[in-house]
Curated annotation (Swiss-Prot):
One Gene Ontology term, aspect cellular component: cytoplasm
A Pfam family per the record: Pan_kinase
A GO MF label: ATP binding
Protein name: Type III pantothenate kinase
Lineage, top ranks: Bacteria, Pseudomonadati, Elusimicrobiota, Elusimicrobia, Elusimicrobiales
Reactions catalysed, as given in the entry: (R)-pantothenate + ATP = (R)-4'-phosphopantothenate + ADP + H(+)
Recorded name of the encoding gene: coaX
Domain of life: Bacteria
């Protein structure tokens, strides 16, 4: 079995594959201090509690956008699984042609998203929107060339910034409020978060499609934990919540001989 870990600024999203079958997904916060022992014990426990034997994990693949945690990830996998993790980063085989002066700094999670999307939809123009701490937009041509993208503040990050800087505003549940005008402060915050982001998403889709693909057809893919919030708004052609961990698995398989 293959263990995949996507390490983000807010949480770690993990998955276990047996062949092409996704057996398990799980999440753990990545905020605060995380030791290799804490993470290693967590991984063993979550596997066992879901009926999976940690000893049957043969490979570990990781995408990380939190450099400070990388050593922790490495040490926990070595100590508790006896495996050295494969890390997505510059120099690996991806099948993606990334050009530009900042190519080496494209997030590992975004690279993994692209790898998976190209595998699912070969020879198609793709726009991938990943919703997390930040919303990222990545355009991939049908020739597997990275055309560019954008980074937007995420929904939960927007809410946290708002309540930290406005004394009378409190945290609310993030959801579709069903209307843009509300009689309550809670509903007004929810409307601002939802419709403000929805409007930005639509604008980014329109502009990126035009700039990167012209009049050619493209597939818009939504992914990431917060992506489900906008699924009913029909801004995506498809919502694939596990895209990043699939991409990690494929990258690991492509680089076994490296």
């Amino acid at each position: 079995m293959i263990l995949t870990l996507d390490v983000g600024n807010t949480q770690i999203f993990g998955g276990v594959y047996e062949g092409d079958n996704l057996k398990l997904t799980f999440r753990k916060t990545s905020k605060g201090t995380l030791t290799s022992d804490e993470l290693g014990l967590f991984l063993r426990q979550v596997l066992r509690e879901n009926g999976l034997d940690p000893k049957k994990i043969r490979e570990v693949g990781v995408s990380s956008v939190v450099p400070d945690i990388n050593r922790t990830i490495h040490n926990s996998c070595m100590k508790y699984l006896g495996l050295e993790p494969f890390m997505i980063g510059p120099g690996i085989k991806t099948g993606l042609n990334i050009r530009g002066r900042d190519a080496a700094n494209l997030g590992a999670d975004r690279v993994a998203d692209a790898i998976a999307a190209m595998n699912i939809y070969p020879d198609r123009n793709l726009l991938i929107i990943d919703f997390g701490t930040a919303n990222t937009y990545d355009a991939i041509s049908k020739n597997k060339e990275y055309k560019g993208g954008a980074i937007q503040i995420g929904v939960s990050t927007s809410l946290n910034a708002l309540i930290q800087n406005a004394a009378l505003l409190s945290k609310v549940e993030i959801l579709d409020p069903g209307g843009a005008a509300s009689l309550t402060t809670e509903g007004q915050i929810q409307a601002g978060l939802y419709y403000g982001n929805l409007g930005a998403i639509k604008e980014f889709i329109t502009r990126i499609k035009k700039e990167c693909f012209g009049n050619e057809e493209s597939i818009v893919i939504g992914t990431g934990g917060m992506g489900r919030l906008f699924e009913s708004a029909k801004v995506f052609d498809v919502y694939l919540p596990d895209l990043v961990i699939l991409g990690i698995k494929i990258a690991l398989e492509q680089n076994r001989s490296v």
